[in-house]
C-alpha cells in the first residue's frame, strides 16, 4: 500500500507525517532522512516505549535499526496514564543520560499518547533539547497526540499541566500497528477522530456516520480517515502552534474529559482518555443545549453514532462513584484554558460549529454538573 505524507509547517520548523503499512520494518531510512544523516556512524537512539508495545513490536524495530548499524537504548515503562508522572520522567531522563546520549542523538517515542507525551517531554528538556521522532502505535496517537508538538506529564492537580511545545523531526505512522490494538483502545482513538468532524467539518462527521465501521478494519478507508484527521490537525497547528487562538478548538470535549480523568484518578479500569473525551463531547453539547445554543436533536444524533461504535455517552457509563459537583469544579478550575480565573469552554452552535466561549459563568457549570450527577441516581 502506497504511503501518504502530511506536512506540518510551523514557524521555525517543518516536518512530515509518513502514513502507511510496514513502516516499522523499514524505519531506518526514514529516520536517517529526518535526522539529515548520510550515515548512522556513532548515532544512538533511545527508544521510549511501554510494556505492552515492547512485548509485541519492539523486537521488530530493534532488528531493523541494528541491521542498519544503529545503536539503540530501549527504555520500557509501565503501560498506562500513571506513567505520565515525575517519577517515570526521572527514570527516562536518568537512563538517557546514563547511556551518554548527546543532543545530536535522538529519542524515539514508540507507543501511544502517554509515551509520545512522556518521551517528547524528556527530549525537550534533556541537554536543552534532543532530536525527537514520534512512532505512534495507537489510533489516538496516530491522528491526534503525535501531531503538533504537545508534550507533558500529569500532576495531582490535573492532566497535562506540566509540559512543553516541542515539535518532532518526523512522525512515522505505521497503520499495521493498529491491528494489534485492543478494541477498547481503538474505539477510544475513534472518538478523537469524530471530534474533528464536530469541530468544524460536518461533512467528515457525516462521512464517519456512513463509513465508521470500515475504519475499524485495516484498508483504504482507515488510511483515508487517518490522513484526513492528520491534515486537519496539521493545518490548525500551522496557524496556531502555541494554542493562543483557534488551536483551542481541538480541546472540544477535553475540559469535561480531563475533569473526569482526574476524578477517576486515571484508572484505566474505569476510564481511558478517548472514552473521557467521548463523554466530554456529549457533555459539551448538552451544556450548549442548556444555554439554548443547539437543539437536543443534534445531541441524540451524536449519541446514536457513539453507541453504534460502542463508546460511552454519559456519566452513568463510568464504573464507580464520582466526586460531587463542587469537587469536579476544582478540577475544571485547573484547566489550561482558564485565563485570569475565568472559565473557557469549547461550545457548539450546530453540527461542526464549535467556538471558544470565554467567561463562562461558574454557577451555570456547577448547576449543570449537579444535574448530570443527579441523573446517575
From Swiss-Prot:
Subcellular location: Cytoplasm
InterPro entries for this protein: Dehydroquinate_synthase, DHQ_synth_AroB, DHQ_synth_fam, DHQS/DOIS_N, DHQS_C
Single GO BP term: amino acid biosynthetic process
Cofactor annotation: Co(2+); Zn(2+); NAD(+)
Binding locations of Zn(2+): 192, 254, 273
Cofactor note as given: Binds 1 divalent metal cation per subunit. Can use either Co(2+) or Zn(2+).
Pathway membership, UniProt: Metabolic intermediate biosynthesis; chorismate biosynthesis; chorismate from D-erythrose 4-phosphate and phosphoenolpyruvate: step 2/7
Known catalytic reactions: 7-phospho-2-dehydro-3-deoxy-D-arabino-heptonate = 3-dehydroquinate + phosphate
Protein name: 3-dehydroquinate synthase
Organism of origin: Bartonella henselae (strain ATCC 49882 / DSM 28221 / CCUG 30454 / Houston 1)
Gene from which the chain derives: aroB
